[in-house]
């Protein structure tokens, strides 16, 4: 059974963790970083993911960022004449995380727990699950990000406590209130905003810089795609720097040009100015905080700990606003970038049976119901109901002799159906005509542990039943998913071949370099015919490299290795021969010395 990895699939960055020996561990990417940018780029038929994709975003218009904002919608991104759904782009990121997790673990990975914002609706959750399937992962559980963070924080805590998780991600904002005690993590309430995050903080800086430049030079940089990408990078960098310093320099030379020549953007942004620009965004996060407290029936005094999640919670003004609202300092003991993936890995351990005595009770973030007469939204399951759950209600017909009932399933909080999110529609047909108000139709909603909705309608008179697993208008059919899985596998195979080809070329280059070095060293020491053979093999490999024919490179590389090996053998033989000759010479000298006889002499005295 393969290990279950925990994945935080973020708007800006993603992170993957695994449970090893009962301890959660974040898996670093090939560049050695613990988080990976959620960026995908397409270049000359090749797919780039993560750091490499982000680095070339300025010059490559075929770069996709923040795709998570479009999950669960019918948005498509067109690249090189092909349209990609958010699920496919997300699957490319997941595939990359999966591949380096496999390299780290040394075994195939097929199972995962993937996190989503608590406020994600059914369509967004389903899209995330589909992305996992396309990437070749069996998604064991979809878990809410704040809940995962609470799991990571509270696993080793003994005392009972009420915690508030404030999760300000790259593109989404969530707040969840949980009660922790005896290994039970119970979500009491959740609230949020799916269109508020760190990207919006970057955007206020971009808008400010565009406005400044327009006033100074009369040029609108927002119309220039490449300039805009440079502004995005500068804004993100400035935002991060202003969490640690009170002012930062933004310098973008040659950002544009006019008839007088190139134009540069040079400005200083202070923390005070930045705080003024994003004040309305921080205030927007306070609405869901108050809502969650109200739904949980709690006051700020009832909160024991505040856990911060997401890179944007490092902004001092954000921390200050939370402290003002809740009257206490946020807890700084968790890494806001990694805590969600760690929680997902722990949940994976719970599913696999590696983590004992942990029970997770999550809630549905939005109310669920159906449209009834007059376009009214009738709720069957209220928001913040613990999941998994099931709820039934009996409805009847609105007209005489009605033989078909349309069931319009919705999610939201507004009183009128038209103002809420449609999850799907289906029909109950084939029951006998009867006066209005007579038929009894039981509608049952089931929400599973992933927060995914299943609905069935049953005519109690005939016991006829119709059921549906909600597929939103933006959802993918099974055929589409299978096609995308096949494409993803083919692309993974193509990526593997590309990597192998690059490695082969590197090995060939290295061999040519070492051969040239060896040829210089053996000059005059071995037979010239052997040297010539190696030189010809080296030139043949060079020619194959220029042609870029991989089979040819492989053959010529083997031929050169053989020639160099022969050269080494000859060199060794030559050296051995020389050593032998020297030894023989030394032995001969010793034999000559053997004829020397020691003589004794006696001194003769003349006066004898």
Swiss-Prot record:
Residue positions where Phosphothreonine is found in the record = 172
Q: Where is the composition biased (Acidic residues)?
A: 596-608
Q: Which CDD domains match?
A: ASKHA_NBD_HSP70_DnaK-like
Low complexity biased stretches: 576-586
Induction info reads: By stress conditions e.g. heat shock.
Checking Gene3D superfamilies in the record gives: 1.20.1270.10, 3.30.420.40, Actin, Chain A, domain 4, Substrate Binding Domain Of DNAk, Chain A, domain 1
Q: Belongs to which family?
A: Belongs to the heat shock protein 70 family.
User: HAMAP family recorded for this chain?
Assistant: DnaK
Return the protein name: Chaperone protein DnaK
Q: Which organism is it from?
A: Geobacillus stearothermophilus (Bacillus stearothermophilus)
